[in-house]
Amino acid sequence: GQERTLEDVERLRAQLGLDQNFFVQYYRFLEGAVQGNFGVSFRQGRPVSEILLERAPATLELAAVSGFLAIAFGIALGVFTAIRRNGFAANAIMTVSLIGVSLPTFLIGILLIYLFSVELGWLPSFGRGETVKIGNWTTGFLTQSGLQALILPAITLGLYQMTLIMRLVRSEMLEVLRQDYIRFARARGLRERAVNFRHALKNTLVPVITVTGLQLGSIIAFAIITETVFQWPGVGLLFINAIQFVDIPVMAAYLMLISVMFVGINLIVDMLYFAIDPRLRADRTGAH
């Protein structure tokens, strides 16, 4: 505060390690980060790891629901629009999907708040609702207000990802349906359902997995906008507040965790790629 003396300021700088040069501070940060210690928040005066653990459940639950909606509806609508590509419903869905691709996330959130919260009054416009604490985890899945509060943020965050996955699945499936082995499967007398889902969809998912995996990482990384619009108490809103108050330890910890998360997601995607694509397994077997 303004009433602090110069001695108090210097004492606080020494306590936080800010009196050291950049390289010493950076080394101490990396040393602590490896052990899960990201220092102390300048604003709250509490360990950053403790603050992140408190906020993580909100973001992870929001990301899980958004990701589930994006994958489930994205794949289903992508398959439908590919199979019924000349139908009115498929063309209507593709036209409407342009909204999800074109509109920015914050505008989608504001429109949903205006419609369902302000005009209709069906759903809350901010906050997480009532939560239940299970050990160190807080969840809103077990309360009605928690589930209601989750609907609008989840739709806002997952809509762009859903339309992206849908259009990608449609494009890939149309390409697969033109392949010779699909024509051969139909010539053998297989049912259309078996051709579409057992053969076409399985091969469609191989290239889709890579993009979908990265998009799931983006859901967590870029939940900042959605959490800000809905004042959702997750790590994204924590990061925005840290920027406003120049809380460097919180900012550094958030960016580092997001980077580690993307590396982990890429590893999982590569493993799934190997499990689904038989050509990769055949290449590895042939190499031995």
Regions found by a protein language model. Give the residues of each.
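N-terminal signal-anchor/first transmembrane alpha helix
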Residues: 1-19, 49, 53, 80, ...
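Hydrophobic alpha-helical transmembrane segments of membrane transport/permease proteins
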Residues: 1-27, 116, 120-143
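Short hydrophobic, aromatic-rich alpha-helical segments embedded in or entering the lipid bilayer
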Residues: 4-36, 182, 231-242
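An internal, D/E-rich "acidic patch" concept
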Residues: 19-75
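Membrane-water interface segments at the C-terminal ends of transmembrane alpha-helices
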Residues: 20, 28-31, 96-127, 149, ...
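Amphipathic alpha-helical recognition patches that constitute DNA-binding helices
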Residues: 21, 25, 29, 47, ...
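Alpha-helical transmembrane segments of integral membrane proteins
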Residues: 56-89, 105, 133-288
